[in-house]
């Protein structure tokens, strides 16, 4: 089993959208669980609206004791949707100790960089879990300067 956490302290960074899209794609060949640990329960909200047609399961739970048992569940991949703040540090700390990989979605905006860097420095690096930053909300009409 692989546990992949989608995290960024900035709200609106695209965490839930990333989780739900990845779950849909991965579910084509694997048993997928989305674990919504965000108190706003955005992934659970999406799942409720989709009804019975989702090709993956969704559970919302912020209890650290339950999160530490994710590997006992019968899934190939667990995708974890996290809160857009660092208020639930105990939940984030628990889930990162269980995670194999962290994806940090962010938009290419100066206002997005400070929360991203804070998330990496304060939460991800201390956990020693492998991570990558994923740029989203990119407008292909805007030229990118590589330097």
Specify the residue positions occupied by each region the protein language model found.
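P-loop/Walker-type NTP enzyme "switch/lid" segment
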Residues: 3-9, 13, 20-94
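Conserved catalytic-core segment of NTP-binding enzymes
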Residues: 28, 83-147
């Amino acid at each position: 089993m692989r546990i992949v956490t989608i995290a960024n302290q900035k709200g609106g960074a695209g965490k839930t959208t990333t989780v739900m899209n990845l779950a849909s794609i991965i579910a084509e060949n694997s048993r997928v669980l989305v674990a919504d640990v965000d108190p706003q329960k955005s992934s659970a909200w999406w799942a409720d609206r989709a009804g019975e047609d989702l090709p993956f399961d969704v559970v919302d739970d912020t209890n650290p004791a339950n999160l530490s048992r994710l590997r006992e569940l019968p899934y190939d991949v667990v995708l974890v949707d996290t809160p857009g703040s660092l208020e639930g540090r105990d939940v984030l700390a628990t889930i990162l100790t269980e995670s194999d990989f962290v994806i940090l979605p962010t938009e290419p905006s100066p206002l997005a960089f400070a929360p991203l860097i804070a998330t990496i420095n304060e939460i991800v690096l201390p956990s020693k879990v492998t991570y990558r930053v994923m740029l989203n909300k990119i407008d292909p009409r805007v030229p990118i300067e590589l330097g």
